[in-house]
């Protein structure tokens, strides 16, 4: 291996050192660098292009369902935060505060937003007067800061991160529930149809829901190292924020009523899940749906065939561009084909075209898939049409591998020892009957650093959650009459235990 190849390649093992491997892929594939301040990163163009692809999909779906983009200040007055006590208690340890402007002390501390409910709700109160103003839906693409003390990991855990946060107000509880479920479905669609990652939909236990929320629902993705990633959350806020910030409206009979609100967000943690799920010991692996370049064309020539090969490759590149394919023709001098193969594998381009004198003579193209190196030969005349089939095949390979991994790593347990032993040996998700008591989760968390990442959603999930909010405990059908795996009391739901990012 040349010095260039040695510097270019991944040296850590995904299987044996997943943390070091992940950090190396993120840096060497040009996604991000570490900032001089601990807990912050510099997002490079290739990494930001992945975020833009996520934005483009979600933003279109949001707008198709009545959401408008807006922007609110990044600083929140302290007394605004204090108006919703659960927000204060939930986020205070993570809030970064501004206390000085220039050389002057501020009259009131300003929080660097950890989330924006407390700065958006007062304006919803101003903008909503009548039932005709509802539903009101706004979203903003921004960054937030949470001064977490835990070890940081690019895209998974950083003090500042990019995300979108949607905020809505509704006339009825039923409409707010429909909104909460719709946004969760859109996050599910993003992972399943765009990122190539199968996810589970669930509800957070009460002790782990968003501060001030009635219910928090999430999508959860399983990583190859057996840990779960919370991929996006949708919160039914009930009337807590509306009460705190006086979001009221006149109904059709001119009676004053309190609105119901929701909030929902997805961060660049999705990029971390994308990298961790699909990439390998050769570098980044990306699904064609989000890859900045979907196809790279690498010419292979001797001096006497250079002109013919490069002309052939350039013509194919032009045809692919006309088909809407994001293609790069790598005609650099000074880099041999082997170096280019390794570099584009490291950078995660899903499909590689190899073109040499034989391809030119036979009017063909050699096509190589990034995930598994599968190589096929296609007729030149059909390549502009066939390329989409190859891109779909690559996506299916990535999704199917992730789906198989998920299916193999959801296990069941009916007692405490089995929960601990299964997670300790295999990782992944362990389904167990649970009584709903936080102390039972704490026993598992203290022993093995695993927690309840979700309670699965059934077909009637919204009605179930609403019933529980009214004080009814509704056993799930598959655990009716069973005992909690930890304490032995009556089980009222299924819990998914896992270690998580």
From Swiss-Prot:
**GO MF term (any one):** ATP binding
Free-text comment about domains: Consists of three domains: the N-terminal catalytic domain, the anticodon-binding domain and the C-terminal extension.
Cysteine-cysteine disulfides: none
Provide the protein name.
Answer: Proline--tRNA ligase
Family the UniProt entry places it in: Belongs to the class-II aminoacyl-tRNA synthetase family. ProS type 3 subfamily.
Taxonomically, the superkingdom here is: Archaea
| Coiled-coil annotated spans | none
GO CC annotation terms, alphabetical? aminoacyl-tRNA synthetase multienzyme complex; cytoplasm
The biological process GO terms on file are: prolyl-tRNA aminoacylation
Assigned keywords, A-Z: Aminoacyl-tRNA synthetase, ATP-binding, Cytoplasm, Ligase, Nucleotide-binding, Protein biosynthesis
Origin species, per record, is Halobacterium salinarum (strain ATCC 700922 / JCM 11081 / NRC-1) (Halobacterium halobium)
Q: Which NCBIfam families match?
A: proS_fam_I
Enzymatic reactions:
tRNA(Pro) + L-proline + ATP = L-prolyl-tRNA(Pro) + AMP + diphosphate
| Assembly, per entry | Homodimer.
Query: Which SMART domains did the record assign?
Result: ProRS-C_1 (SM00946)
Lineage at the top is: Archaea, Methanobacteriati, Methanobacteriota, Stenosarchaea group, Halobacteria
UniProt-listed Enzyme Commission number(s): 6.1.1.15
């Amino acid at each position: 291996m040349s010095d260039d190849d040695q510097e270019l390649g991944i040296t850590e093992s995904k299987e044996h050192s997943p943390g070091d491997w992940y950090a190396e892929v993120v840096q060497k594939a040009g996604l991000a660098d570490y900032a001089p301040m601990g807990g912050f990163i510099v997002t490079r163009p290739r990494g930001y292009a992945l975020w833009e692809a996520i934005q483009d999909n979600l933003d279109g779906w949001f707008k198709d369902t009545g959401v408008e983009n807006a922007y609110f200040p990044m600083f929140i007055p302290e007394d605004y935060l204090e108006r919703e006590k659960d927000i204060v208690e939930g986020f205070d340890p993570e809030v970064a505060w501004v206390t000085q402007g220039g050389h002057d002390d501020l009259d009131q501390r300003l929080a660097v937003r950890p989330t924006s409910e407390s700065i958006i709700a007062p304006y919803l109160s101003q903008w909503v007067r009548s039932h005709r103003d509802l539903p009101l839906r706004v979203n903003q693409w921004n960054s937030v800061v949470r001064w977490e003390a835990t070890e940081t990991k690019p895209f998974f855990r950083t003090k500042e991160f990019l995300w979108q946060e949607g905020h809505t107000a509704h006339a009825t509880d039923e409409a707010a529930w429909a909104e909460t479920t719709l946004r969760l479905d859109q996050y599910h669609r993003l992972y399943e149809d765009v990122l190539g990652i199968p996810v589970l939909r669930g509800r957070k236990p009460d002790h782990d829901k968003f501060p001030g929320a009635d219910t928090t629902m999430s999508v959860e993705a399983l990583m190859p190292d057996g840990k779960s990633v919370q991929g996006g959350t949708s919160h039914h806020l009930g009337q807590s924020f509306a009460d705190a910030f006086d979001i009221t409206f006149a109904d059709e009979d001119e009676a004053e009523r309190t609105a119901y609100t929701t909030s929902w967000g997805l961060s660049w943690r999705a990029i971390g899940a994308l990298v961790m799920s699909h990439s390998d010991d050769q570098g980044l692996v990306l699904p064609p749906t989000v890859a900045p370049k979907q196809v790279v064309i690498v010419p292979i020539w001797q001096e006497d065939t250079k002109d013919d090969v490069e002309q052939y490759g350039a013509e194919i590149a032009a045809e692919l561009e006309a088909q809407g394919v994001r293609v790069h023709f790598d005609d650099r001098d000074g880099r041999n084909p082997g170096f280019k193969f390794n570099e584009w594998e490291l950078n995660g381009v899903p499909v590689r075209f190899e073109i040499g004198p034989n391809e030119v003579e036979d009017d063909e193209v050699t096509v190589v898939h990034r995930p598994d190196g599968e190589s096929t030969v296609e007729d030149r005349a059909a390549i502009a049409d066939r390329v989409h089939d190859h891109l779909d095949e690559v996506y299916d390979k990535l999704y199917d591998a992730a789906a198989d991994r998920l299916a193999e790593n959801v296990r069941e347990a009916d007692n405490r020892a089995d929960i601990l032993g299964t997670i300790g040996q295999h990782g992944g998700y362990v389904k167990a009957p649970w009584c709903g008591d936080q102390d039972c989760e704490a026993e598992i968390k203290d022993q093995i650093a695993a927690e309840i990442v979700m309670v699965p959603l059934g077909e009637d999930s919204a009605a179930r959650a609403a019933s529980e909010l009214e004080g009814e405990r509704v056993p799930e059908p598959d655990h009716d009459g069973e005992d909690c795996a930890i304490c032995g009391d009556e089980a009222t739901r299924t819990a998914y235990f896992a270690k998580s990012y």
